[in-house]
Amino acid sequence: MEKMMHRETERQRRQEMASLYASLRSLLPLHFIKGKRSTSDQVNEAVNYIKYLQRKIKELSVRRDDLMVLSRGSLLGSSNGDFKEDVEMISGKNHVVVRQCLVGVEIMLSSRCCGGQPRFSSVLQVLSEYGLCLLNSISSIVDDRLVYTIQAEVNDMALMIDLAELEKRLIRMK
């Protein structure tokens, strides 16, 4: 009688372990399984996959933090460290900052969401007139303000672009 109970318990344990291994196998991506493997190989691949995911999480966290620092710098528009002055400038009417960046020119345009912001197509037209080609554009809403961050490169390297003049032109736009 005791032997039969022991066999039944062992059979249930094996079935449960088989279902747990199947569940583990179903959670792993195909490139971590690679054909029919022993259970110890599957567990090792699961450990490798967990380590891989932990590395990716760390990399993405660092990337997120870097992007947040960049976006804060872009939003504030200056590196002089005068945070209060920058916030006051941005919280007023339309605000434009034009500066050089690695790829060419970066433009940060901020305006109230409720109206008065220049149309994006008008901004693109001005960039085209100055010989700039749009590379990247990000728009977001921050504290009831519409913020465009635009990166553009110079089409013709022979052209010298007056950043102050471009900034004034973008400020005058309605």
UniProtKB/Swiss-Prot annotation:
SUPFAM superfamilies: HLH, helix-loop-helix DNA-binding domain
Stretches assigned to the bHLH domain: 1-53
Principal place of residence: nucleus
SMART domains, per the entry: HLH (SM00353)
Keywords: DNA-binding, Nucleus, Transcription, Transcription regulation
Keyword DNA-binding set for record: yes
Subcellular location: Nucleus
Superkingdom of origin organism: Eukaryota
Expression tissues: Expressed constitutively in roots, leaves, stems, and flowers.
Short name of any one Pfam family annotated for the protein: HLH
Biological process terms in GO annotation: regulation of DNA-templated transcription; regulation of transcription by RNA polymerase II
GO cellular component: nucleus
GO molecular function per UniProt: DNA binding; DNA-binding transcription factor activity; protein dimerization activity
InterPro entries, per the entry: bHLH_dom, HLH_DNA-bd_sf, MASH1/Ascl1a-like
Assembly and oligomerization: Homodimer.
Name the UniProt record assigns to this protein: Transcription factor bHLH36
Taxonomic lineage from the root: Eukaryota, Viridiplantae, Streptophyta, Embryophyta, Tracheophyta
Gene name of the record: BHLH36
